[in-house]
């Protein structure tokens, strides 16, 4: 049985003070959660948020990282730095990174490998555009992404990582994939993992849905057999909304 995982991606929101206030408010609301709870603040908020979640069931993730340990990469953060801080998870290959920062599947794969070297659990994002969905090439696109994103990993690593299926057309648009669409597509992603690493590994990989997840949509989504959680954007910025999702 896979343990559900709900992660909040705060994106470029919340000052340090606001981040601490949000986590303070969140802690009592999610203390009895039956799923893994993760918050992913901005880099500058990580130390304060890590301090605030001590003793609670909330884990902390970063929103990105570089694949090198150090070097002349102005503005970047290395996995070594995240590991030293005590970060547990790291989002890799979010559609906004792919869209605005030209991140490729090859880059994603380098980051995934490096994350494991530093005891970080990657939340690997994949998804198709509206054009690709309407052109009936969703499966082809996702297979292409997964086969590169997850190449040359050990079975143990693949079992540990989290995949987030986020249809790009449903991010921040208010549009969502139907529960059936999400379940079917996540099931397909699992078959791609199976073709690479076998049935046993594929059955253990946790695959989230991401794309305008709200308190009103989560229950039906989580009732689907293939969906193991959610990567939540805007709704993770309010303790009331995020806790309602976590306590689905």
UniProtKB/Swiss-Prot annotation:
One BP annotation, GO: gluconeogenesis
Function summary: Involved in the gluconeogenesis. Catalyzes stereospecifically the conversion of dihydroxyacetone phosphate (DHAP) to D-glyceraldehyde-3-phosphate (G3P).
Pathway of action: Carbohydrate biosynthesis; gluconeogenesis; Carbohydrate degradation; glycolysis; D-glyceraldehyde 3-phosphate from glycerone phosphate: step 1/1
Listed name of the protein: Triosephosphate isomerase
Gene3D superfamilies, sorted: Aldolase class I
Record flagged with keyword Isomerase: yes
SUPFAM superfamilies the UniProt entry points to: Triosephosphate isomerase (TIM)
Native source organism of the sequence: Clostridium botulinum (strain Loch Maree / Type A3)
Family, similarity comment: Belongs to the triosephosphate isomerase family.
Subcellular location: Cytoplasm
Pfam family, one: TIM
Annotated catalytic residues: 94, 166
Main location: cytoplasm
Catalytic class of the enzyme: isomerase
Enzymatic reactions: D-glyceraldehyde 3-phosphate = dihydroxyacetone phosphate
Disulphides: none
EC assignment: 5.3.1.1
MF terms in GO: triose-phosphate isomerase activity
Subunit comment: Homodimer.
Binding site for substrate: 9-11, 172, 212, 233-234
Keywords for the protein's UniProt record, in alphabetical order: Cytoplasm, Gluconeogenesis, Glycolysis, Isomerase
KW Cytoplasm (keyword) present: yes
């Amino acid at each position: 049985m896979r343990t559900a995982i709900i992660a909040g991606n705060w994106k470029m929101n919340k000052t340090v003070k606001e981040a601490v206030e949000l986590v303070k408010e969140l802690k009592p609301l999610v203390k009895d959660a039956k799923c893994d709870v993760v918050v992913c603040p901005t880099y500058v908020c990580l130390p304060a948020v890590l301090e605030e979640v001590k003793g609670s069931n909330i884990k902390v993730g970063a929103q990105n990282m570089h694949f090198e340990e150090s070097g002349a990469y102005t503005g970047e953060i290395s996995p070594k730095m995240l590991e030293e801080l005590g970060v547990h998870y790291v989002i890799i290959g979010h559609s906004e990174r792919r869209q605005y920062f030209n991140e490729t599947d090859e880059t994603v794969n380098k980051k995934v490998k490096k994350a494991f070297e530093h005891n970080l659990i990657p939340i690997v994002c994949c998804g198709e555009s509206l054009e690709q969905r309407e052109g009936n090439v969703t499966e082809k696109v996702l297979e292409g992404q997964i086969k590169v994103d997850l190449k040359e990993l050990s079975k143990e690593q693949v079992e540990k990582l989290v995949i987030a299926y986020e249809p790009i057309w449903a991010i921040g648009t208010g549009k969502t994939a139907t529960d059936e669409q999400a379940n079917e597509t996540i099931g397909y992603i699992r078959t791609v993992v199976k073709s690479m690493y076998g049935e046993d590994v594929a059955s253990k990989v946790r695959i989230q849905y991401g794309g305008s997840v709200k308190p009103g949509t989560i229950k039906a989504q989580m009732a689907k057999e293939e969906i193991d959680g959610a990567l939540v954007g805007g709704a993770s910025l309010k303790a009331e909304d995020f806790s309602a999702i976590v306590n689905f």
